[in-house]
Design a protein with these regions (language model features):
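Structural signal for membrane-spanning alpha-helices in multi-pass inner-membrane proteins
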Residues: 21-25, 48-56, 83, 87-91, ...
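Transmembrane helix-loop-helix hairpins at the membrane interface
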Residues: 86, 113-224
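Alpha-helical transmembrane segments and their membrane-interface exit regions
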Residues: 47-54, 105-106, 185-197
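Juxtamembrane loop-transmembrane helix junctions in multi-pass integral membrane proteins
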Residues: 1-4, 32-35, 111-115, 195
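Transmembrane helix-loop junctions in multipass membrane proteins, especially transporters and channels
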Residues: 29-30, 57-61, 92-100, 174-175, ...
Length: 224
């Protein structure tokens, strides 16, 4: 069965993000283009953000009637903070799947912190990635596992099988596999519990945003 327009609207931004991530990992620091691979994150803001803007009207889960209540938003923030707290402690060697695809150390050649790079990285992680990933992993993949006509699936009825399988695939896309299981299951649980993708997006954004601040404060660049 061919994928619907709604499916492609959720797949394309994610595919563009993964393509740029692979390019950043494959491009050596010294390359013929004279391009610093770390600045590919700026392309993410433009390319992936542009794709999300292009398809935005097709994302019904972000309509006004699907916004979370104050209580639901508070729950999402709490979940995001809990995931952050667990994520930074789930980094033992056995909790890793190989090495990160592309290391990100925002330091200049003379050892100074490169704040423009940090700003670009943080904005992408806290604003673009949560929307793009939740649209793909939860809105599309989790519901598609429940039924190929995923647009008709109420997230509250997606079921345990869809949660587990989508979280497993989510894990495969991350180096810290155990942390990814915790995060993926938490965001999926929020989506199923509230029926609102905004809650998963808020939690994801809180996790990524606070993680970025912590990374800069602690100098633990390996978490980026």
């Amino acid at each position: 069965m061919p994928l619907s327009q709604a499916a492609w609207a959720r797949i394309v931004p994610f595919a563009l993000f993964m393509l740029l991530l692979a390019l950043r990992g494959a491009l050596p620091e010294q390359n013929a283009l004279g391009l610093d691979p770390r600045w590919i994150y700026a392309l993410n803001l433009v390319v992936v953000g542009g794709a999300l803007a292009w398809f935005w009207r097709g994302y019904g889960e972000f309509d006004r009637q699907n916004r979370p209540s104050l209580r639901e938003a508070g729950l999402a923030v709490a979940v995001g903070l809990i995931v952050f707290g667990l994520w930074i402690h789930l980094d033992a060697p056995w909790m890793r799947l190989g090495e990160a695809t592309a290391a990100f150390v925002p330091m200049t050649a003379d050892g100074r912190v490169d704040w423009p790079l940090i700003a670009i990285r943080w904005l992408g992680a806290a604003l673009i990635v949560p929307v793009m990933e939740e649209l793909f992993w939860r809105s599309f993949l989790m519901r598609w596992i429940a039924s190929p006509q995923f647009e008709t699936v109420d997230p509250r009825a997606a079921g345990l099988r869809a949660l587990v399988l989508s979280t497993f695939v989510f894990m495969l896309a991350h180096t810290l596999w155990l942390a990814a299981i915790v995060a993926g299951a938490a965001y999926a649980w929020l989506y199923i519990r509230t029926g609102k993708l905004w809650c998963a997006v808020i939690a994801h954004a809180v996790t990524n945003g606070v993680l970025g601040i912590w990374v800069v404060w602690s100098g633990r660049w390996e978490f980026w």
